[in-house]
Curated annotation (Swiss-Prot):
Keywords: Host cell membrane, Host cytoplasm, Host membrane, Host-virus interaction, Lipoprotein, Membrane, Metal-binding, Myristate, Viral budding, Viral budding via the host ESCRT complexes, Viral release from host cell, Virion, Zinc, Zinc-finger. Myristoylation is required for the role of RING finger protein Z in assembly and budding. GO terms for cellular component: host cell perinuclear region of cytoplasm; host cell plasma membrane; membrane; virion component. It is a lipid-anchor. Late-budding domains (L domains) are short sequence motifs essential for viral particle budding. They recruit proteins of the host ESCRT machinery (Endosomal Sorting Complex Required for Transport) or ESCRT-associated proteins. One of its GO terms (biological process) is viral budding via host ESCRT complex. Its main location: virion. This is RING finger protein Z. The gene is Z. The keyword DNA-binding does not apply. Interacts with protein NP; this interaction probably directs the encapsidated genome to budding sites. Interacts (via RING domain) with polymerase L; this interaction inhibits viral transcription and replication, Z partially blocks the product exit tunnel for the releasing nascent RNA product. Interacts with the glycoprotein complex; this interaction plays a role in virion budding. Interacts with host eIF4E; this interaction results in eIF4E reduced affinity for its substrate, the 5'-m7 G cap structure. It comes from Sabia mammarenavirus (isolate Human/Brasil/SPH114202/1990) (SABV). Belongs to the arenaviridae Z protein family. A zinc finger (RING-type) spans 43-79.
Amino acid sequence: MGNSKSKSKLSANQYEQQTVNSTKQVAILKRQAEPSLYGRHNCRCCWFANTNLIKCSDHYICLKCLNIMLGKSSFCDICGEELPTSIVVPIEPSAPPPED
């Protein structure tokens, strides 16, 4: 009766991918701004922050400005696109790999 397939348990990585795929707007947190041809990226709203940036369509915004904008509406004041509501924090090593 019904479906005889058993449900397999998802690993932590598969669960994270499933939850990331199910959300609408997902952004990756940039701890350090990546240099470009024209210099470093800064927050397009306050122009001061160059760490902990979130990419919004074609520009970067800092966490402080993102929180302020999300308090007002779900759309960006600069580009008019929907603001990211989920942030994926990449795991970065805190020390260099051990030498053999």
